[in-house]
Every structure is written in structure tokens, then in C-alpha cells.
Amino acid sequence: MSVQEVNTHAVLPPIVSRNDKEFLESIQRYITTETKRVGCKEEGPADEYYTIYRNVFDKFSATDRKIIFQVIDYVSAYKSILTAIKKEYDAFIETIKKGRRTAFYLHGKLKVLAKEPTALVYHQRRAIQLEAKMRIIENNSTAIQLQIDQMKQLRMEYDKKEVKLCAPSRQLWKPIPGMTLQDSVNLEALNKHKQYLEDKYIKLKQDMSTMYVPAQKKAELDEEMVVLLNRRDIAENLKKDRQFRHQRLQVISHTLTPWMKQNMRISFQDVMERIRKTKAIYGYDNIVDEIFEDDPNKKKEAIVMLHYIERFNDLISLGEYERAACFAANSPKRILQNTSTMNKFKAIGKIRGKPLPLLLFFEAIFNTSQAFKRPINADLTMEGIKCGLSEERLDLVTHWVTQEKLTFSEKAGDIIFAYGEQHTYHKPRCLALAQIIYNECGLHRKALLCLCKQGQIHEAMEHIQQSKDINTDDLIQLITACPQIDLIRCLTQERNEKPPFLSFGLAVLHMFSVDMKKVGMRLLQEVSKGEKDVIEHLVMSDLFCSLEKWQEIANICLQNGFKILFNDIMSILRSQAGVSEISEDDTTNIMEHVFW
């Protein structure tokens, strides 16, 4: 085969050795791994690609040092060529980055230059507006300055006129009054006129000391006059009082003198009738009425009471509500402890930052009630309790009730009871207060309800045992208002070998009839836990529940799933002599033997 024939054949590609292939694959894996780690896309940011490919050739990098050494060791003949390629690659990348930074800077500068004409127009327009405002301000300042100058000029002219008016108008050349022109130049005539004026001055001075008094003296005389008039009024009142007493004693003397002379033969009642006839004959109406009056100081007391009322109204008008409340509480005969005074305080309403005036009034009158040895009436008591509870002052109401400063009534207890039902936190204290009031009023049923709601079941049982007014209907109402299992259990159990206070059967039937099925179910559940002997004793010892009603209870047990209890009750009922079960479809007449 010739050389030409050999050259005409296709050239085969160089065969890559296994080591070269592994080396290239390791470099490719590094590039792929770094690209994925950075998160570059195929069209991703060039900066990140530059960094990755540069690290491939960076022989000073710690992570890629082994790779580049392998390349150099593997192809040591191309070391200078690879180094040159790397430098050229780095220079190319830096040139591209620098070009980008320059383009970004120039682009921003171009935008600024493009906006300069618009900004210039805006600045010029703003300068024109400010110049217009400055002209307006200057014009206003000029006008104000002109007004100030005019006012100064007017003030100067006014001061000049005032000086001219205040100038002395005395004229020395005016002739002397009472003298002619010739006498005014004559020395003797002038001496005589001087002596005349001196005598006149002395006389006027004497007249001032005798005929005139100063204004201070007049004020002193007026005060003395008022004192004398008050003394006169007091003397006149004393005179009238003594005249009245004299007339009264005279009437008594005219009547009793003959009676004493007759050795008191006439009864004293006839003497009193004569005094009354004296009233009709002589017209001594006021005198005779005063004789039979129990309180001789009634007029003085009326004056004192009137003064108290006026003083109270003054305190209200001045806004001194605390002093007014104390004044009303200490008023004589409690004239200010009434509903009209309460309405005055109620009309004031609430004052921000101060206690309620109405509460101050009630607090004052309740605190002084023991001083009068008589509690406040029922109407004011209820209003006071309402006021205290509305202001959330249960502590005050507790103090009033426990210290017996109130008039206890059923309505007062109901108010406190209702407040406790609405406010769960204060319910125990309200129930205790209501119980005190109900006990004082003799309302044992409501007091019993308060005990039960407080959970004092044993005290309630003792209360029922001691009270004779509580009957079965009252107990039914009690368990309706307070459906507690412990209460019903105690009421339906025997105590000291005595029958229970309430029938168990009636209690169960009542619970189911008033939509308290849960309570009735719990009662049946407790009974079903007992043995048949206990159930039989319960049925047979129940004197108030008939056998027909126990059959109703058995039907209720069957309807609610207590089948065993149903069977026990029915077997107990069937075991009774003369008792037979009648079905609903049976038409047998029970009273047939009576009519035939």
C-alpha cells in the first residue's frame, strides 16, 4: 500500500485516554455543581458564570488548587499557554464589568440631564409665586406702618390738647371779688377786707365742727340704728309673748279661782269645759288653744325648722353636697329625711370625679338612724339599697343591714336577692343579707330559699323542722326554685324515725311535669342503685303518693330506660292485697259493685 492510498482514508479522532476522560469529567462536575448551588439558569446572570469559570482556572483558590495542579502536572507543556488564556479571560471579564458600570453611571447622568429643564421650570414658577407673596406682605406692612404713624400723630395731638386744657386758667389781673378797682389799690381797704375774710373763715370752721359730721360718723350711726331696731323688735316680741302668757294665766285664774273657793266640788273635766266656753264667750281663741297645746315651744321649733330648710337649700345651691347630706341627716325631727329631699339629690345626678350626691345623702341618714333610736322608713330604705347597689357599694349595704340601720321589708330583701342573681361574684353575700331581712320580716319561705341557694342544706332542714307554717306546696316551690339533688334527698329522707318532709314520688312527678327532666332522671338513677327492699320501703312509707301515682312513676321509668326499676315498682304494686293492674284497653268499671 502506497503512502497516497493511506492519506486518502478518513482520519480517525484521537483516542482519549481513561485518565483524561476522568479529569475532564471532574472539571465538568465542578462547574455543574457550582452552577446549581448558585442557582443560575441557562440564561442566568453573567457575573455568576464569570466567577464559576474563573475559579476553574484560579490556581490560587483553596478549593480549586488541586484541579489546576492536576492540569499543570498532566499537561506541563501547555502551562504557559493556559496561564495566558486565564489572564486574558480575567481581563476580558473585568473589561465587561467596567463597561457595565460605566453604562449604568452614564444612564443615570443622562436621566438627570433630561429632567433639568422640567426642574428649572418648576423652580422658576415657585420663584414667581414667592415674589408675589413677598409683594403682598410688603404692601400689608406698609399699610400697617401708615396706620401706626397716624395713630401716633393723633395721640400727639390729643396730648397737646389735654395739656392746653389742664393749663392754669387763673388770671392774676382779675379784680378782687367785693372790692372796687380803687379799693383794690388802697392799703387800708385791703386790710379791712382781709380781716373780713379771716372772720368768715373762723365762722365757717366753727360751723363745720357743729353743723356737719364726717361720712364715717354716719356709717357708725347707721349701725347703731340697726342695733337699736333689733333690740326694739326683740322687746316687742317679748312684750307680745308676756302679754299672751298674762292673758292665758288670767283665763286660768278666772276659771280656777271659783273652783278653789267651792272646795273643788266640781270635777276637773267640767272646769276644762268652762275654759273652752271662755274661748267662745270672750274670743280668746289663741289663748285657749295654747293652753291645750302639748308643746308650748311649737312656734320656736317652727322657726328653727324653717332655718334648717333654708340653710339646706343654700348648701345645695352652692354645690356643697356632702355638707348638705350631713345637714339633712341631723335635721330636727327628721324634717329633711323624706322623699322630696331625696329627689333633690337625685336630680343632681353624677359629678365626674366625685361620689354620687344621692349616695352621700343615704350614707348620712343611715349612719345617724341609730342616734334617733328609730330606723329609716321603708321607702327611703329601698331607694337607699337601690342606690348603693347601682353604685356597686355592696359594702355599704352590708353595713346598713348588719347594723340594723334600715327598716326591713320584703321588697328590700327582694332587691338584694335579685342583685345577687345578676352578679354571681356577690351572690353568697347577697343571699346572706336577704336571709337576714327575710328572717326579721318573718318570711320563712324566702329565708329557706336563701339557705338552700347558699348550700346550707342541714340548716334549712332545721329551719323547716322548727317552722310550723311551711307545708308541702311550699316545699314543692322550694325544689322548683332550687332544684338541688342534695336538697331533694334530705327532704325525702326520714329524720330521727320521723316521716320525711316531702314525698319522693311527688317530687319525681313534679320534676318531670315542670321540664326538669335531668333532675328527675338523677333521682331515679339514685333510687335504681338501691336494692329492692329499699325501693319497697320507699314506696310503702310514702303516705302522700297514691299507688296510681306510683304507677305513673313506673311508666316514666320505663320511658326513660330504667326497666329494672320499672319491674321492681310494678312487682311491689302487684304484691299489695286487692291491687290488680288494669290495662288501658280494659273497659271494666271499677265502681260497678257499688251501684249493683
From Swiss-Prot:
Keywords: Coiled coil. It holds the Pfam family Clathrin_H_link. It comes from the Eukaryota. The keyword Coiled coil applies. Residues 129-241 form a coiled coil. The keyword Coiled coil applies. PANTHER family: CLATHRIN HEAVY CHAIN LINKER DOMAIN-CONTAINING PROTEIN 1, CLATHRIN HEAVY CHAIN RELATED. This is Clathrin heavy chain linker domain-containing protein 1. It comes from Mus musculus.
